A protein has these predicted regions:
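N-terminal secretory signal peptides
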Residues: 1-11, 36
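N-terminal export signals
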Residues: 14-37
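Beta-strand-rich N-terminal accessory domains
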Residues: 16, 44-132, 407-410, 414-417
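Acidic/polar, glycine-enriched structural segments that form the non-catalytic walls/loops
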Residues: 36-60, 65-70, 74, 168, ...
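Non-catalytic C-terminal accessory modules of carbohydrate-active enzymes
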Residues: 93-95, 101-182, 187-193, 704-707, ...
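Aromatic-rich carbohydrate-recognition surfaces in CAZymes
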Residues: 115-120, 125-129, 136-145, 209, ...
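The feature captures the catalytic groove of carbohydrate-active enzymes
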Residues: 194-196, 204, 278, 293, ...
């Protein structure tokens, strides 16, 4: 698909930047015009939806828009990194309140909803719950029950637009005399985990009076206090820029996991516009909701509290809009729940420590939820401005919209309960989330191997995991536990995963290359070296020291592979190359030479013995139990190690070249024969890609079916499938699909890469599946953040901080690329253009900086460079290195926000 296909269908960049960040009632200029142009008219008819019939769902836009049936499954995470999350539903409702130190799908307060009251001068007032109408089914033991008042009138329809971290809902209702739109977000700033780690949901309702007469408008938000049960209370507070209800419970035990505070607030409301109820009237039946609705429906404001209060509080802002006027009301919900324990969240603990409070990092920053609200009120203009700069940079990219959509939508995983930070600031991750517990604890090495988002967007968090892996989870003999316990460092997991351990070595190399922090590498290197040498212990993966893993290899498919196979074998080759480079950088030439020898031996053997002419296969070799080193068998594979079940055999495996993919990400080049690598990728695409799965047979977990398309984990083109193959062979995982797509892109197979990404994202259309939740073993699965690697591959923007060298080689099919970059030292944008006689690169820093000694561009032959750093001319020379022209600057240059680098190369 041509890159320019993304721009014509959705012209709403204004939605990412036109709402003022100041006062709640601030005039916002042409606030809703873009929405009016792009949305359905206010007749109640839904706009065109992503949930149209399958044959019509061929294109994905960015931002992405949903309506009608496409609203059903939407749950858009609103939260910071490591804070828990609340999700915004497609109709405008808040759902899945997962802020209490564990996943909690389906959890909701009995009452949580926004309301609107509007009266045009001389007309009858209209009162509505500020959500689109509830869609079928309506069946339950009490119908839909009374919670969240499903029987109250709602708006006729809505259109949802998502470009993470911003969500926008345009509501439609012909009977409402004003137009209303919701914009919801939480600050997200690349590289700044603190600014991106705030426990708050920001809900900004934008209003416009399209009529010829003034209209009085009231907006209210009601929320039940969820801090325990008996003893809940709320107090009203006003502070600089924020008014609201601080909800707490003085009767709850200090150690209770639900002990904490919440805030329902409004930002920047002028004096006299705010009214509130600390609690609804306490009465029998549903009198509290009835009394609130009667009160608000009278005039769009709230009267004072009744003497006896129930735990539902409300806050309202009432104003008059002149004809044609626009305004915005910004609500926030903040929370503070410090008592995270391993047992409650689903993390396996060190012996006897299941109930130990490991805490939350955000709770160390703020004393309670009111402190969060105060901070946000003061800092929001800056935080939102920084967030919008990032969102604008993403949206301005000329990369295909499906690639942007996949990368940004899965970035939300870092802000769900899949990931958290303990009180000491350490970063940890489940594999995913079950409905009420984390799924598969321990920052699992073989799952987190695939994703690239953390290292590129929040590198300090990636380095936190590296420190846990190498400083606290490596045994004296080099065995790295492939899961970690909490509290971290008290106990080491008993087993190693071959792919996980080798992948961690490549990730260590990646994080060093991105940061250039050799002191940090030196601190981790002793255990890293042990972890690599562990492969060659007696009874180990490569006990005969030939660079090939023949031993018993536990891996990400939750079984042990017996004998040489490409999945673990190529990871090993990549780890050997990474080990060689790190050893050499630290002055350990002997180890570097040994690792290189093993690498050369292993690559020759794998190409000669595992490549069948089309792809790489496994040679199954049984082992006697007594020949297997301790810690290599987890017990999830076959019972007989001499005749093991659950092998891949002659499968065409989607991630058979996973280590090669990672080698491209980190700049280590080819680990295997280049032609064989490309043949294998073509074979995976030929044999495993399905445009339609209606005839696909699978008894396993089902993530794609019927007319969905997808890429199978494995196929058996030769027909030689083991009677009992490895368990997941017939499944479809987005985390593998994106990794495969990224590798296709690295190899120049652009059309195939894009088709894989588009196919995966079409499955998440809002009707069939939530576009912001790609599951595998649990919701919000970490592996799916491999979607960020597709950006990395297509951008071709590779940086080595130790060398201060940037290699720029876009892998798109256009002669001009605009995109963005993120590195530990800063982030910004870049452009690359092919000229009639040469090429041009322009690199800008939005925040931070980028130090460069040289820039490498693809091409051969003599060329003349012209280099500008801001307004300054920089001298440079050009040398050829294979297929590259390397522009060496006469001095180190630093790209900064006020100093863009422009390099023109003419031949």
């Amino acid at each position: 698909m041509a890159d320019n296909r993304r721009t014509s269908e959705y012209r709403r960049r204004d939605f990412l930047k036109k709402v003022a960040t100041g006062g709640a009632l601030a005039t916002t200029g042409p606030l809703l015009r873009a929405a009016q142009e792009a949305s359905a008219p206010t007749t109640g008819k839904p706009a065109a939806s992503e949930a149209a019939p399958a044959k019509a769902r061929a294109r994905i836009t960015y931002p992405r828009t949903f309506a009608g049936r496409g609203l059903k499954m939407i749950a858009f995470p609103l939260a910071g990194v490591g804070t828990g999350t609340i999700s915004l539903g497609g109709r405008g409702q808040l759902r899945d309140w997962e802020i209490f130190n564990r996943p909690d799908k389906g959890n909701s307060p009995d009452y949580c909803f926004a309301s609107i009251w509007a009266q045009a001068k001389g007309r009858r007032a209209v009162t509505r719950v500020l959500e689109a109408r509830i869609e079928p089914p309506y069946e339950g033991e009490s119908g839909l029950g009374a919670n969240n008042v499903p029987g109250l009138p709602r708006l006729a329809g809505a259109t949802f637009t998502g470009a993470y971290p911003f969500a926008q809902i345009d509501f439609h209702d012909a009977k409402l005399p004003v137009q209303v739109r919701l914009e919801a977000f939480n600050p997200l700033v690349p590289l700044d985990a603190e600014a991106s780690g705030l426990p708050v949901a920001i809900l900004r309702y934008a209003l416009r009076n399209p009529g010829s007469a003034p209209a009085k408008v009231g907006l209210a938000f009601s929320l039940q206090n969820m801090v325990g049960k008996e003893g809940r209370q709320a107090i009203y507070r006003e502070d600089a820029g924020v008014s609201g209800l601080l909800m707490s419970n003085p009767m709850i035990a200090a150690s209770d996991p639900l002990m904490g505070t919440m805030v329902l607030g409004v930002l920047g409301a002028p004096a006299g516009t705010v009214s509130y109820l600390k609690g609804w009237k306490r009465a029998q039946w549903w009198d509290g909701a009835l009394t609130f609705w009667d009160d608000f429906s009278a005039d769009g404001a709230l009267t004072r509290d009744a003497p006896a209060l129930n735990p539902v509080g409300s806050i309202a802002v009432t104003q008059t809009l002149a004809a044609g006027a626009e305004a915005a009301v910004t609500f926030l919900i903040a929370w503070h729940f410090p008592n995270r324990t391993p047992e409650r969240c689903g993390w396996e603990a060190a012996e006897g420590k299941g109930k130990s409070v490991v805490g939350n990092h955000y709770c160390e920053r703020f004393k309670d939820a009111w402190a969060v609200a105060q901070y946000v009120a003061h800092e929001l203009p800056t935080l939102e401005g920084r967030t919008r700069k990032f969102a604008d940079a993403v949206q301005a990219s000329s990369l295909p919209p499906a690639v942007l959509d996949a990368a940004m939508s899965n970035l939300s995983t870092l802000r769900t309960n899949t990931a958290f930070r303990t009180a000491d600031g350490e970063f940890h991750g489940f594999e995913g989330c079950n409905d009420q517990r984390g799924c598969c604890h321990g920052s699992c090495t073989h799952v987190w191997n695939y994703e690239q988002a953390t290292a590129f967007v929040f590198p300090t968090l990636a380095r936190s995991i590296r420190e846990s892996e190498f400083l606290r989870n490596v045994r004296d003999n080099g065995l790295m536990g492939f899961r970690s316990y909490l509290p971290d460092g008290l106990q080491i997991w008993e087993a190693a995963a071959a792919d996980g351990q080798m992948g961690c070595l490549m990730k260590l190399y990646r994080d060093w290359q991105l940061s250039g922090d050799s002191d940090w590498l030196r601190r981790l290197w002793p255990n890293a070296k042990k972890a690599l040498e562990f492969a060659t212990i007696k009874g180990g993966w490569d006990a005969d020291h030939d660079g090939v893993m023949e031993g018993v290899q536990h891996n990400t498919y939750d079984v042990e592979f017996y004998g040489p196979n490409p999945l673990c074998g190529v990871w090993y080759l990549g780890a050997l190359r990474a080990g060689e480079e790190m050893a050499r950088a630290l002055g350990d030439e002997q180890s570097a030479g040994e690792f290189r020898h093993l690498f050369e031996s292993g690559r020759r053997w794998i190409d000669a013995n595992l490549f069948n002419g089309e792809y790489y296969i496994q040679k199954v070799v049984g082992r006697k139990s007594e020949e297997v080193a301790a810690g290599l068998r987890v017990g999830m594979g076959g019972a007989d190690p001499m005749k093991p079940d659950y092998q891949m055999g002659e499968a065409c495996l989607i991630d058979q070249l996973l280590g090669q993919y990672m080698a491209h990400v980190v700049g280590l080049g080819y680990l295997l024969d280049e032609n064989n690598v490309r043949k294998a990728l073509r074979s995976v695409y030929r044999y495993n890609y399905r445009a339609d799965l209606s005839e696909h047979e699978a008894v396993q977990r089902t993530y794609a079916l019927n007319d969905d398309g997808g890429v199978l984990v494995a196929s058996y083109p030769s027909g030689k499938r083991p009677e009992i193959p490895f368990p997941y062979f017939a499944e479809v995982w987005t985390g593998l699909e994106y990794q495969f797509a990224a590798h296709l892109a690295f190899e120049g197979m652009y059309a195939e890469a894009l088709n894989v990404v588009e196919t995966a994202r079409r499955r998440h259309d809002g009707e069939r599946r939530n576009p912001w939740n790609e599951p595998e073993c649990g919701h919000h699965y970490a592996r799916a953040m491999s979607s960020w690697a597709v950006l990395v591959a297509l951008n071709g923007f590779h940086y080595s901080a130790p060398e201060k060298r940037l290699t720029l080689a876009p892998r798109t099919r256009t002669s001009n690329l605009r995109s963005f970059w993120t590195l530990p030292s800063g982030w910004g944008t870049f452009a690359h253009s092919q000229l009639v006689a040469g090429q041009k690169a322009e690199i800008r820093a939005t925040e931070g900086s980028l130090a460069l000694a040289s820039l490498a561009l693809e091409g051969r032959g003599k060329a003349r460079p012209a280099v500008k750093l801001g307004i300054e001319t920089v001298s440079a020379s050009v040398r050829e290195e294979g297929n590259w022209r390397v522009i060496a600057f006469d001095r180190e240059v630093s790209v900064a926000p006020d100093r863009p680098l422009v390099v023109t190369l003419r031949v």
